[in-house]
Amino acid sequence: MKKSKDGDELLMNKPIIKERQSAVVRAFAFVACILSLASFAHSLSAQEVAYPDEFATPIPLMGEILGDFHFPISSDSALAQNFFDQGIQMMYAFAKLESARSFREAQVADPNCAICFWGEAWSWGSYLNGAMTTADAPRALAALKKALALIDSANEKEADLIRSLESRYIDNYDPEKRRIQDQAYADTMAGLSRKYPNDLNIATLYADALFLLEERRGYRRLEDPNVIRLHGVLESVLARDITHPGACHLYVHATESTPTPELAAPCAQFLGTAIPGASHINHMPSHTWNEMGLWEEAVRANTIAWHSDQKAAIGRGVAIYPTHNLTMLYYAAAMGGASASSIQASKDLAKLNGNSAMHAMSLVRFGRYDEVLALDNEPNGDVNRSMYLFSQGY
């Protein structure tokens, strides 16, 4: 069948059209693939460096909650400096999340502040009460990488602090194998403490690094070389500033399980008010007072701490380990014969975590046997249940 000229041209051009269509399809497919990979990479990055929900809300400057402690940085932004000081104080109080959020606001105030990113990286790391988690490890590493990228804007001391974390934060972090990184970090901080012998914060950070190498619990022998070294570093700070909140906090822990817990008493007298609204700092002197049998002082410290925990609901305190504060309050009051304080603390504890064992034991301590028998909220857990049942049978 004879085709028209136009038809012949159309027929002749079909391979060209198909080729062009195929090229367009391939181009669209390539772009779609790139976009898909980019989306996947972004999603993967978001999964690797995810942050707690609290980070969606900026943390304010805390004003009356904070103390006078100051850690000068090279930023020209007064706001960045204020948030940096807040971050340091929160970390010295073991309020890790509030610390990281404060350093974030310092970064917002001065995006070129390398040491502000160091602060965030430091706050995500291991500390006395726990190893860095696998969730926090990528957060720490991401903040460190930002600090390193901005390191030219830092002064020499800040740059040294930033680089000190390179030995501490690695890819593929394994909490079970962190001793290698912790030792390397402690060695680096030892060098910095020698380079900057008059910097009390660097010395405190060195002591913090040494503590990571120690068992958290258990008896400490005063003749142990590691204990001698740790005590020596902290005592060198406190000899120059007995009000240093970070050094005294660590020193209380470093001495409480030795034969001489009273060594921390001079600085403990100042520690409770060093960061007025941080409940853990309010509470910390009681570790020393309990070991010394100074029950009234321990009750007072933990009462203030519990008040700070409650004030956190209206933004006038920072709640840190509230159940621990109440447990120590119940115990110190029971030992000191303060029945009202002990029983009320045990009631508050039961409301907070559902554990009625302390309430039952406080009633036994003060001979309130009818009230013991009236209890009907048996707690969970073998130890707590055994205490509760003991009180019922007593």
What are these regions (language model features)?
Residues 90, 124, 167, 210, ...:
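Residue at a conserved register position within TPR or TPR-like alpha-solenoid repeats
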Residues 78-85, 113-124, 154-173, 198-218, ...:
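Amphipathic alpha-helical repeat scaffolds of TPR domains
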Residues 79-102, 173, 391:
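Alpha-helical segment of the N-proximal tetratricopeptide repeat
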Residues 108-109, 195, 238-240, 270-277, ...:
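Solenoid-like repeat scaffolds
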Residues 28-39:
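Bacterial N-terminal signal peptides
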Residues 47-76:
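N-terminal pre-domain segments of enzymes
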